[in-house]
Amino acid sequence: MSQDLQKEVASRKTFAIISHPDAGKTTITEQLLLFGGVIRSAGTVKGKKSGKFATSDWMEIEKQRGISVTSSVMQFDYNGSRINILDTPGHSDFSEDTYRTLMAVDSAVMVIDAAKGIEAQTLKLFKVCRMRGIPIFTFINKMDRQGKMPLELLAELEEVLEIESYPMNWPIGMGKELAGLYDRYHRVIEQYRSEEDERFLPLGEDGDLKEAHEIQKSLYYDQALEEIMLLDEAGNDFSRERILAGEQTPVFFGSALTNFGVETFLRTFVDFAPAPSSHESNEGIIEADNPKFSGFIFKIQANMNPAHRDRIAFIRICSGEFERGMNVTLTRTGKSIKLANSTQFMADDRETVNRAVAGDIIGLYDTGNYQIGDTITNGSKKLEFEKLPQFTPELFMRVYAKNVMKQKHFHKGVEQLVQEGAIQLFKTWRTEEYIIGAVGQLQFEVFEHRMRGEYNSEIRMEPIGKKIARWVKEEDADEKLSTARSMLVKDRFDQPLFLFENEFAINWFNDKNPDIELTSLL
């Protein structure tokens, strides 16, 4: 790989934003896009009433509900770096999509609501990042409102997440009393709601302001200095190595809604976030500077442009250089594919991309070639990157087309939405009626909404309740074992499994059939 190309790869910063719903993830994404010069004004999720919608919430149902249910991809340049942001679903029902997205990034930004601290979904997603060993940057949001005390938030962060923290800045007051941020890294105080030329006040060697200023009259100024002294004496030492190893999280305070502390965060993040990392494969570690092009598909999205009924496969480039028109091998099938139609994104806006390098996320127009988890490369034809996580669904519904004359629309819709991985498809053993499985109820609502809106197919869903899915070997798929409490079905790859009513039904089945091995997904 040439030095120029190595430099280009090193400039990539590819990260996901994770949080619990309503922590302000979409708002901070909007502000980052603002600083990247991509949008002129940030439309927050509050725009549900005003008709202004967030850039990353492009799907109709997301606009209506104000939650992210698909992972958007956005790209911009900032301070010599190419930023690739993946905005992940905050809702727990879509955790599988989020988990797959986290396999495609080199670091994560965790957004925490200052009033609520660590919430359930944040903890779940944090654990995945920890499992991958990627750096995690923390942004404690909504400091313009009353919330938990900063020291309390730090203690909770370290205790619940079991990670070291290092506050890069420290709030001077909060809520109505918020006066500024003491920036430990840049050695300045950033004033809240001040003119641009007066916003940053330099600090002296003693840690206080070089010159007297009004902010020192704030009730919370002395308290902030005392807390910073405490952090200097008793807190963790700053360690770039531990940050890159995912063992220490730099913590930033701010307010995404009032755009306070966000650009300072972005500037610092770009300094510290890692360049594209290596990826594990069946042929060993594939480094980003490997000259052979390779990548994996972590997401498929149908109908990003409803007028064209298209399908886009999102690929994380792991090594080498992509050039439009190049020939690659889809290693799952051994098929040679010409990558003639490729695109980069700003939510639903897109432009053709002629070249991209390791770390970039690009979209490939898909006519049905790809599956989630596929590897493509112009190198070894047997290369496969590590498998992406798939969750065992817990809720199941039979699904039918209301209008039998529109079976074609119905089957196409089910097939495409299942290929996206947002919902899982099963069929009854003999009659092959459709059963769909999901992790949570919202997935069914989104499925129904999209079938109606994107495929013109009204559907009827009949709950068959909460079930426990367990796969069996083909030779063990005996229809005589199928009962109301242990229904034999097949998945979309025609692999047999039983849907059990409860743990008792599984235990009963195991007692009666000790030689049959039951397996689950994640």
Swiss-Prot record:
Q: Which CDD domains match?
A: RF3, RF3_II, RF3_III
Q: What is its main location?
A: cytoplasm
Q: Name one Pfam family in it.
A: EF-G_D2
Subcellular compartments: Cytoplasm
Q: Which GO MF term does the entry hold, naming one?
A: translation release factor activity, codon nonspecific
- GO biological process annotation, one example: regulation of translational termination
For the tr-type G domain, which residue ranges apply? 10-277
Q: Which GO terms describe its cellular component?
A: cytosol
The positions annotated for binding GTP are 19-26, 87-91, 141-144
List UniProt keywords, sorted A-Z: Cytoplasm, GTP-binding, Nucleotide-binding, Protein biosynthesis
Q: What does this protein do?
A: Increases the formation of ribosomal termination complexes and stimulates activities of RF-1 and RF-2. It binds guanine nucleotides and has strong preference for UGA stop codons. It may interact directly with the ribosome. The stimulation of RF-1 and RF-2 is significantly reduced by GTP and GDP, but not by GMP.
What's the family?
A: Belongs to the TRAFAC class translation factor GTPase superfamily. Classic translation factor GTPase family. PrfC subfamily.
* Protein name according to UniProt: Peptide chain release factor 3
**Species of provenance:** Listeria welshimeri serovar 6b (strain ATCC 35897 / DSM 20650 / CCUG 15529 / CIP 8149 / NCTC 11857 / SLCC 5334 / V8)
